[in-house]
């Protein structure tokens, strides 16, 4: 099956045809490091980590860059409020971000470029845009002239005259068009700044990604990812800068993940309804958070709640219990390779359908639970290899069930619930042999079942 991705630029699911099959290029917008990241910031990291893993499975060389924005007005304000140096603040929160994402089992990208390490490249790119007539100086600033690009707005599908409503666009008298955006801004003596042909100043937000992509990945790249909220103006402006500076296309496939909602509202710092990743990690294992983020399609909104997290933990308990087995010691088959037509691979090749991939994991776990002893090594290896594409099942099963309310046989409450649900379904399917097997298994573990009209109750 061919890898197919929903391309925001074309508005449809496109076959992925790389520029160079021997060097796949992927760029994802990273954090602005002035605070700890919330779970909404983590969603694109986890989503595109799955894409990175999939691309590594399909191609010999994948170059993945995810930037760090370490110069921004929010950073300047936060450092001033805290009474600390900007570099101290950004280094602290850069490390905190790395630690949090490691807890979610996100792979480290090939390249992690920092904005402040690329000021010369930004200045050079701005100079090219000025020279080509796509940018101009005004009121001490350098701005991109959106009217100089005939197809400006092609990513968001907005017309120039309509795109200001509801967008993060500053309207000012010194602009030729209200949609013109800042490439370079002046700095006061108290603010960080760098010397440039337009005076001492600092870059605008949008130019950072374009300059870093050009340096590390090239004029045109395969895939650019980020949150849905970045489509306009950030990614629209990236396209304008990249295309106009280099006279080429910029990105061939644009991918955007959906919002995370809390109680039906988009989670955001402005609404005060955000949940920090590190706070959630005090209550849940990082793999539980990851599983929850992958429980729905990446382009769909995800209503984040305690129920979603509890269901994620139960789902993982079911998978880990299949690996744990029933007391037998079974090692995964050595050297197992996931076949190219495996259901998990096929699901991910279909625009990263992680929910379908997770369902396929549960199907393997179900087979593993029913398998004869001789068949278990291969099934266990298959489950681990398939889960690795999703960044899941990285903990030893016995360790997973530690620090939970578990029976002497290693069964947590959630694992027991999962087995009871499986037994109920087996009875509905008239698979009475499996239903009896589960009852016997739970009885051996000291769990008593009581079938009632309301359902099955269990007790230790």
Curated annotation (Swiss-Prot):
Quote the InterPro entries the UniProt record gives. Answer: Cys-tRNA-ligase, Cys-tRNA-synt_Ia_DALR, Cys-tRNA/MSH_ligase, CysS_C, Rossmann-like_a/b/a_fold, tRNA-synt_1_cat_dom, tRNAsynth_Ia_anticodon-bd
Positions that bind Zn(2+): 29, 209, 234, 238
**Cofactor binding note from Swiss-Prot or TrEMBL:** Binds 1 zinc ion per subunit.
List where in the cell it is found. Cytoplasm
What EC identifiers does the entry list? 6.1.1.16
Q: Give the primary localization class.
A: cytoplasm
**Is DNA-binding one of the keywords?**
no
The first-level EC class reads ligase
> GO CC terms on record?
cytosol
Instruction: Show where the record puts the motif 'KMSKS' region.
Output: 266-270
Give the reaction(s) catalysed.
tRNA(Cys) + L-cysteine + ATP = L-cysteinyl-tRNA(Cys) + AMP + diphosphate
**Residues involved in ATP binding:** 269
Family according to the record: Belongs to the class-I aminoacyl-tRNA synthetase family.
Subunit structure, per the record? Monomer.
Q: Quote the protein name from its UniProt record.
A: Cysteine--tRNA ligase
Its gene?
Answer: cysS
